[in-house]
Amino acid sequence: MDEMAATQASKDPGAKFYRKGLDAMKAGNYPVAIVQFAKIQHSYPKSPLSEPSQYFIANAFYENGKYEQAVLQFNDLTMRFPNSRFLCESLLREGQSFVRLNDRIDARLTLQKLSSNNNCSDESVAANNMLKNLGSD
């Protein structure tokens, strides 16, 4: 957990769910992590922990091999939080999810969107490498 999230978590009513979710993520118990982070989404949607919780839900689905659900959750994050500090990572993971689903068209579109984002330098490099590997149809 980063310092900003730790500070927010200590004051937030959803902090106990956030901590339990992070602990479950670290332990590789992704279904439990999803449940804990979802409690924040449902009970405290305006919480400062809502944004990182959304990211961790999406990431937990990805890590658990549930790529369709991951795509939906990463997309939800980018729609709900268009200026998210997790935007670049989310677009990359969404593109990776599409690749895992063998959806080359949506993978390419997502990775191109990421590649053209000037604020995502590290992730743009990864996106460009993935685009090269996808080739052209």
Question: How would you describe each model-predicted region?
Answer:
Residues 1-137:
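Acidic, polar-rich low-complexity tracts and alpha-helical solenoid repeat scaffolds
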